[in-house]
């Protein structure tokens, strides 16, 4: 019993903090008054009790990548991960595992924020470099209302030992992001240290709440090791908790949110003999392999993730590679003391509930780690409640509304009072 008590003392420092890194201080102002007609081709409106409810569609990019304790160098090309050559999404959520090696000094010591700073710097440069060359030379075209930059901004970045999640939005969306918060759960050594577990982040965009869970579950390819992974999932869903807010109307638990996505190195393996697994991988028999995929089997048997969804997997297993190569671990020769690890889809992205539609589910090919990154693109519906015209006229002159009408022809904007 005493090791757990010792660990809990450590956790008060290492996991107990709700602090996170962001480009702006959290926006908790509930007095958001709409100033635009939201004349966007993506929106549709419904009249309701003298207010107007608008449904907007946003694109959300989600990725997960176990980087194997590798610190990225300044020249790492993020194009493969972020696909910045494509039309940018509105929101980017990037999850990482093993951003630091999982040795005792990192697990028991304070978090090395230099590593997360390095990753965030690479992400910022990649996202904003893509946007700038395509902007109009007129400064007014590159900024939203009140001069808010269109550059992508980090609204939440949180690291727990080797787990890092970082969330980025277009700069003009920031005024409508409220109540960002984090929740860390350790499931590792002694059942509570942060070498395994999750970092969950939540925020509200307009009237819709989001929760993203970045996790690293128990490893192991032996029979019944999946039971420990199932236990980790249940612990994460049970123990993750967020503040309810001053009005006690904010979601507290993960599944209470409107849009929920679970991503990470879930570590589920393929329940087939190693040699058979390798042969099926070589012949790209994905369907046969997926029939024996532990995550899918556990979901189908009702052991975990009831009501969750995953997109169609059409890519090769993402683990375990020889770093800086296209060869799976063990394909050449074994050392006597090496463990045999068959290929598996360890890295996954799944979601819960309605309001999310997945359009892409792929893997990247960056080779610095023994894992390949996995990424997905969703569209999501966002609810916006517009106040009555009398309220608007109390705050805004006709001249101001006329100017907002001009802005509406290009984009939609809100302001806070």
UniProtKB/Swiss-Prot annotation:
InterPro entries: Endo/exonu/phosph_ase_sf, IP5P_plant, IPPc
EC number in record: 3.1.3.36, 3.1.3.86
GO MF terms, alphabetically ordered: inositol-polyphosphate 5-phosphatase activity; phosphatidylinositol phosphate 5-phosphatase activity; phosphatidylinositol-3,4,5-trisphosphate 5-phosphatase activity; phosphatidylinositol-4,5-bisphosphate 5-phosphatase activity
Phenotype upon loss of function: Increased salt sensitivity with reduced production of reactive oxygen species (ROS), reduced Ca(2+) influx, as well as decreased fluid-phase endocytosis.
Annotated region (Catalytic 2), positions in chain: 339-354
Family that this chain belongs to: Belongs to the inositol polyphosphate 5-phosphatase family.
Tissue: Specifically expressed in roots.
Pfam families hit by this protein: Exo_endo_phos2 (PF22669)
Keywords from the UniProt entry: Hydrolase
Function summary: Has phosphatase activity toward PtdIns(4,5)P2 and at a lower extent toward PtdIns(3,4,5)P3 but not toward Ins(1,4,5)P3. Functions in salt stress response by regulating reactive oxygen species (ROS) production, endocytosis, Ca(2+) influx and stress-responsive genes expression.
Enzyme class: hydrolase
Disulfide feature: none
SMART domains (alphabetical): IPPc
GO biological process: cellular response to salt stress; phosphatidylinositol dephosphorylation; regulation of clathrin-dependent endocytosis; regulation of reactive oxygen species metabolic process
Substrates-to-products reaction catalysed: a 1,2-diacyl-sn-glycero-3-phospho-(1D-myo-inositol-4,5-bisphosphate) + H2O = a 1,2-diacyl-sn-glycero-3-phospho-(1D-myo-inositol 4-phosphate) + phosphate; a 1,2-diacyl-sn-glycero-3-phospho-(1D-myo-inositol-3,4,5-trisphosphate) + H2O = a 1,2-diacyl-sn-glycero-3-phospho-(1D-myo-inositol-3,4-bisphosphate) + phosphate
Protein name, as recorded: Type IV inositol polyphosphate 5-phosphatase 9
Region entry Catalytic 1, spans: 258-273
